[in-house]
Swiss-Prot record:
Its EC number is 2.8.1.13. ATP binds at residues 6-13, 32, 123. Disulfide bonds join 99-196. It is found in: Cytoplasm. This is tRNA-specific 2-thiouridylase MnmA. Gene3D superfamilies: Adenine nucleotide alpha hydrolases-like domains (2.30.30.280), HUPs (3.40.50.620), Translation factors (2.40.30.10). Catalyzes the 2-thiolation of uridine at the wobble position (U34) of tRNA, leading to the formation of s(2)U34. The keyword tRNA processing applies. It comes from Gluconobacter oxydans (strain 621H). Keywords: ATP-binding, Cytoplasm, Disulfide bond, Nucleotide-binding, RNA-binding, Transferase, tRNA processing, tRNA-binding. GO terms for cellular component: cytoplasm.
Amino acid sequence: MRILVAMSGGVDSSVVAALLKRQGHEVIGATLQLYDHGQAAKPGACCAGRDIMDARAVADRLGFPHYVIDAESRFRDSVVESFADAYARGETPVPCVACNQGVKFTDLLGMARDLGCEAMATGHYVRRVEGPEGAEMHRPVDAERDQTWFLFATTKDQLDYLRFPLGEMPDKAHVRALAQELGLEIAAKPDSQDICFVPSGSYAELVEKLRPEVRGEGEIVDEDGRVLGRHEGVARYTVGQSKRLGDIHTATGERQMVTRIDVPKRRIVVGPRVQVSEADSRRSVRLRDMNWLIDAPAEGVRCGVQIRAREKLREALVKPLENGGALVELTEAAMPAPGQACVLYDGSRVLGGGFITAGDA
């Protein structure tokens, strides 16, 4: 089988390419150049100069062709600019979802089909299972590396074409051992970080540079509008966090957390953590840009939902809406952050997902 492998220059995708080559497949490697702002030597970067060289070195050693696609413009528009826009609205975006769906899968899947490939493989920790009605997305064996939450926007057609060989791997140590066994020099290379395109490591500095209107101090207030302190910029906060609130914890005698971000007024609204679950949380949440990996059930579906990348599942009834969104009715109140993903699960299977909106349901 002719398979295109999306190669980031890291251990995971390199092992995927090597395994498929060893299995006798005709492998073609491809890497997207997403940016180049001195990232070649930055630990945790992805798809920059050094990574492209590492991917090409693997392809040369194993003897298969490797292509580089210049996707800087699309990446800047689809990921970086939208990332800054979201924070300027008081949301907490998930850039990895935008990158996977708006850049990587768009460009690489198109290239794979143009090259006559029968499938495209990636180094994501996801299981693809052939179900009675077609391909299904499931959590991987290695729960610590689960990336299904970040791939909820993968469409049915894309899932049919994609392959995820690492979904059955027991852990990352096993993958690194395979890399050594396969003779890959990058076996000990560090993993990429969550926000790989932030050169300084401070996402807030990037947002403030791209959207100067969010710069500047403002007030930290309680739900009654009483001023409790000052903050250094609204882009530095997200709903649910309790860090960077200064001495407010000791001033009030109760540990506080962010409940709302009022961008026009430059206000961070906080409330006591012990009371937030009842006073400021929500049992109903609206989602936008819903992607279903099952036939959208008109009457709704009872399932588990995950409203943050590393949070527990919550029981809910999810109903499709005519505007392409969905209404999530939680059995227990939660503090969803606008802009984050809400992903639906039935056991290990991903049913779909969408983005949390700021409006009340």
